[in-house]
């Protein structure tokens, strides 16, 4: 899927002049249901791969766009997000790999270990690092604030969230709250195309959510046509994603937990999804 049109334009003020630059995002499916994503800064020519699920697919996408990869921004250590790194390093010897500091040893070959509040740079673009433990203990998200884009790996999915493998559910809930606090207009790119299955589950939690029902129909139409359901937005997820709505009274009533601690409600929903 080629989304390599300008996603956002911003102005950088210098002392005596202004430069207008565009950020380009190219998203493509690889492996079974992973998304590869390239971020390109046209002002400098810098290009980053968000994770590296399939090195050859990433290289092919970069070649098709006429871009040279300069960076890899890794969200977490799982194999389907890092197994392409050796191929990328072989093709691009000057590649700089950024990754969670807490998982750098496990990933290997990390040039820039990153923690909460650090910045990853792609040319003149700057992504603030948000630590989102839960799916893995060191998972991070890259938030390009000025471009209003977040690359969330496997922490948040459209209508879903990642399985909680390495922390208690309450920790994952805290991570989701961080993402929920981003501006509603933020475009969200996730690691997988899971949306249609997530919609089926979400409707078992909130069958009377009219916005969710309408969105599920739109998703079915997109997938039937072989089109992606991503990016999503924070606003869309707050309205329809049961995992972000665990503190909503209507959702808590729907799962039989009125007035519950939101972290407990989240854990209940996550457990139901694991068994779905």
Identify the meaning behind each predicted range:
Residues 38, 119-145, 149, 181:
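Core dinuclear metal-dependent hydrolase active-site scaffold
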Residues 160-186:
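Active-site-adjacent loop/tail segments of enzyme domains
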Residues 47, 54-131, 148:
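Active-site HxH/HxHxD metal-binding segment of metal-dependent hydrolases
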Residues 52-53, 77, 102-103, 135-136, ...:
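Active-site metal-binding loops of divalent metal-dependent hydrolases
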């Amino acid at each position: 899927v080629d989304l390599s049109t300008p996603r956002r334009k911003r102005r950088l003020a210098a002392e005596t002049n202004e430069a207008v630059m565009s950020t380009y995002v190219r998203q493509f499916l690889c492996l079974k249901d992973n998304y590869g994503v390239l971020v390109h800064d046209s002002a400098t020519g810098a290009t980053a791969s968000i994770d590296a699920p399939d090195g050859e697919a990433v290289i092919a996408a970069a070649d098709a766009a006429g871009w040279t990869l300069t960076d890899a921004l890794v969200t977490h250590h799982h194999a389907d997000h890092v197994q392409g790194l050796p191929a990328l390093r072989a093709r691009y010897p000057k590649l700089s790999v950024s990754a969670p500091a807490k998982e750098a040893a496990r990933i290997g070959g990390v040039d820039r270990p990153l923690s909460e509040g650090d910045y990853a740079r792609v040319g003149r673009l700057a992504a603030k690092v948000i630590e989102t433990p839960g799916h893995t203990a060191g998972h991070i998200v890259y938030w390009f604030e000025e471009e209003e884009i977040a690359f969330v790996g496997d922490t948040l999915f459209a209508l879903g969230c990642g399985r909680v493998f390495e922390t208690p559910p309450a920790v994952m809930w805290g991570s989701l709250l961080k993402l929920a606090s981003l501006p509603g207009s933020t475009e969200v790119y996730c690691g997988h195309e899971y949306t249609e299955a997530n919609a089926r589950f979400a409707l078992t939690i909130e069958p009377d959510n009219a916005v969710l029902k309408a969105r599920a129909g739109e998703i079915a139409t997109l997938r039937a046509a072989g089109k992606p359901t991503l990016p999503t937005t924070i606003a869309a997820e707050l309205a329809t994603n049961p995992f972000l709505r665990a503190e909503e009274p209507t959702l808590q009533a729907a799962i039989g937990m009125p007035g519950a601690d939101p972290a407990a409600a989240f854990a209940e929903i996550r457990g139901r999804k694991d068994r779905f």
